[in-house]
């Protein structure tokens, strides 16, 4: 008993198995995470260090250097790089690809905790694994013409941030920009010295007077009372009443030697949006989170908080990753629908049999659903690589379906068999070797992409696995399921076929004449192919190359740098000239700008920063044309800024894989 006979005898079981796989895949498509990129763990860790307002020289000696020396002892560290500025430092550690980054992350935290006691008091740190989740999935700006920046920051920090952090899948919500309210103590040095005191005495007195500590407990009448001492300042006047010195000659209070002023904390960054000083908040997702669901949850939560947002405060979304993902999903859906429609049309035109056309309508969705089931088992996600693989595989799936269906129906009509079962199974057996060769050749092309190293391999592994899986499943369905379905659908009536149809006659006639002339003068083939090979080679040598394809993502990023030594105020003045140009472009919907701070939250000098420009949806000029126009207008101004223009997706990868610098 050969395989074809065995398959026919177990046709119900096989069809049930394929149906279960397809239905399970369709169900898994609802649970599969949705993201822009595959979940890639780059062999890179970033450490953010904060030590108050120390000058950069002291920061490098007292904080950065000890931490670096401690981190060098971690096994697997390949390179180590640091950036130090006033009160802050960033350290980037690169490991080898394939390193266990969870273990490396824990080792980094352990080493910093070991060295933390010798660092200046109050030093804090944050260790971040670099992966696609370091880029926000959705971000908003808060601006107002009537509210101060301190109020806007408090709104973001204490109202919006805690509420948005409760949305399922959200890892954290960060706030940038604005002003932080503080009280400034201006000491009269002459008066202070006249009382025989120093600045340290003032600082120590303020620290000791503004505390909340537990002092013990009392058990009484069967109850336990926890005692605390709360001497925190409650009013503006409480600060001035702080006792600096007490003795026989009297008590000296802070108000006797200093003036207390209400002020704002010094800021070393500038953040704007749409031409106004702004506060930005970014939402980051957990690894493996569903980006589309998170974005929908954030929008719903903000809508529910609308009554808590003061009048005159404007919220604008300057980035929404879910919009690009939804567009990718729609493109993949369109590719499937168009592919199935064209395949059905071709089969109907040339074979003129609706039953054979039904094969394509069954095979393509079944293969894609079964592939989605495999993606779910492998804990992958819907992203531009897997969706691209599914869309690219549609044509190959249809090819397997068409050639098998055409071969079966041709054999049935040639034999003019009254009982088609034996003919169908025989035709399927005849076509097994060509089908195996065709599928294997294509799989061999894409399978090696899964073994590439570095960033390329990390991304193309998802594409390779998706295409290889879909082609293997397509082969199995074309080899097993289609013949079984054909034995049940095709009848003796389908063996009757009149090949005198007009389209068939025209096609056969043109093909015979063309091939007859070509075979009489085979040298023509050489003369036609050689120029094509030459043109292809020249195109290959001159075509531009890049990691990510150029696509309209609805926005772009401008990194800029002023001449070295430029102050924050001067850089801000230069950048506002670019903002003025941005506001004149009709295609710009909104934008955000950072100076002294990076898009990924990394440190920048006072003369560096970036723009994130979001364009309006709908009909408009191409994104490259808009960028060229803006670049030209900025150049006409004679600006001293150096700019680097980039796509959103490439910037995301650069932030995670290496710091992007203009």
Language-model segment annotations:
Residues 123, 394-408, 432-451, 458-498, ...:
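Transmembrane alpha-helices and their membrane-interface boundaries in multi-pass membrane transporters
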Residues 1-15, 415-426, 455-461, 480-530, ...:
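Interfacial helix-loop-helix hairpins and adjacent transmembrane helices
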Residues 1-341, 349-350, 355-357, 382, ...:
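Membrane-proximal extracytoplasmic
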Residues 35-38, 321, 372-389, 450-467, ...:
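Short helix-loop junctions at transmembrane helix boundaries
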Residues 1-34, 429-431, 498-548, 628, ...:
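Signature of alpha-helical transmembrane segments and their immediate interfacial
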Residues 25-31, 36, 314, 341-410, ...:
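Hydrophobic transmembrane alpha-helices and their membrane-interface caps
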Residues 524, 529-633, 648:
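Juxtamembrane segments of multi-pass membrane proteins
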Residues 318, 325, 329, 405, ...:
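Helix-loop junctions and hydrophobic alpha-helical segments within the transmembrane domains
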């Amino acid at each position: 008993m050969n395989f074809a006979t065995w398959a026919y005898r177990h046709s119900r079981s096989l069809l049930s198995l394929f149906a279960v796989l397809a239905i399970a895949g369709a169900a898994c498509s609802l649970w599969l995470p949705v993201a822009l990129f595959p979940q890639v763990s780059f062999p890179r860790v970033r450490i953010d260090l904060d030590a108050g307002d120390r000058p950069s020289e002291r920061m490098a000696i007292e904080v950065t250097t000890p931490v670096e020396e401690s981190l060098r002892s971690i096994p697997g560290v390949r390179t180590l790089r640091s950036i130090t500025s006033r009160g802050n430092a960033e350290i980037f550690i690169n490991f080898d690809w394939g390193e266990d980054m969870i273990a490396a992350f824990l080792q980094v935290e352990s080493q910093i905790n070991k060295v933390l006691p010798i660092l200046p008091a109050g030093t804090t740190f944050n260790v971040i694994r670099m992966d696609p989740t370091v880029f926000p999935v959705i971000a908003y700006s808060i601006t107002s013409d009537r509210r101060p920046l301190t109020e806007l920051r408090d709104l973001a920090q204490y109202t919006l941030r805690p509420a948005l952090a409760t949305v399922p899948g959200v890892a954290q919500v960060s706030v940038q920009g604005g002003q932080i309210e503080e009280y400034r103590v201006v000491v009269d040095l002459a008066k202070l010295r006249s009382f025989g005191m120093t600045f340290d005495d003032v600082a120590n007195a303020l620290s000791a007077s503004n505390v909340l500590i537990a002092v013990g407990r009392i058990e009484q009448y069967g109850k336990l009372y926890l005692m605390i001492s709360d001497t925190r300042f409650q009013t503006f006047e409480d600060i001035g009443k702080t006792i600096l010195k007490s003795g026989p000659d009297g008590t000296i209070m802070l108000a006797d030697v200093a003036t207390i002023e209400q002020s704002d904390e010094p800021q070393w960054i500038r953040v704007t949006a749409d031409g106004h000083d702004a506060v930005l908040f970014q939402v980051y997702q957990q690894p493996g989170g569903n980006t589309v669901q998170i974005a929908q949850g954030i929008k719903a939560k903000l809508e529910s908080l609308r009554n808590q947002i003061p009048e005159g405060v404007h919220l604008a979304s300057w980035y929404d990753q879910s919009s690009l993902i939804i567009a990718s999903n729609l493109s993949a859906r369109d590719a499937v629908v168009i592919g199935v429609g064209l395949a059905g049309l071709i089969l109907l035109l040339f074979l003129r049999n609706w039953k054979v056309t039904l094969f394509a309508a069954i095979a393509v969705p079944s293969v894609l659903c079964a592939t989605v089931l495999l993606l779910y088992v492998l804990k992958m996600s819907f992203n531009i690589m897997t969706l691209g693989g599914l869309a690219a595989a549609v044509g190959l799936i249809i090819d397997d379906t068409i050639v098998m269906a055409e071969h079966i129906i041709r054999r049935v009509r040639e034999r003019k068999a009254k009982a088609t079962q034996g003919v169908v199974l025989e035709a399927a057996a005849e076509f097994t070797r060509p089908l195996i060769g065709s599928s294997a050749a294509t799989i061999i092309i894409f399978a090696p992409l899964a073994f590439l190293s570095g960033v390329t391999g990390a991304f193309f592994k998802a594409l390779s696995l998706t295409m290889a899986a879909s082609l293997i499943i397509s082969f199995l369905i074309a080899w097993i399921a289609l013949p079984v379905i054909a034995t049940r659908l095709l009848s003796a009536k389908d063996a009757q076929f009149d090949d005198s149809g007009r389209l068939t006659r025209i096609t056969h006639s043109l093909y015979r004449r063309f091939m007859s002339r070509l075979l009489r003068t085979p040298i023509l083939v050489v003369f036609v192919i050689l120029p094509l090979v030459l043109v292809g080679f020249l195109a290959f040598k001159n075509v531009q190359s890049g990691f990510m394809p150029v696509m309209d993502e609805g926005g772009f990023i401008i990194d800029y740098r002023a001449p070295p030594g430029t102050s924050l105020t001067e850089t801000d003045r230069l950048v506002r000239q670019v903002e003025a140009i941005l506001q004149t472009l009709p295609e710009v919907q909104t934008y955000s700008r950072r100076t002294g701070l990076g898009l990924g939250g990394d440190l920048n000098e006072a003369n560096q920063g970036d723009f994130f420009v979001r364009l309006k949806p709908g009909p408009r000029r191409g994104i490259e044309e808009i960028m060229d126009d803006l670049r030209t207008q900025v150049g006409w101004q004679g600006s001293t800024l150096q700019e680097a223009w980039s796509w959103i997706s490439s910037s995301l990868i650069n932030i995670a894989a290496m710091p992007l610098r203009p």
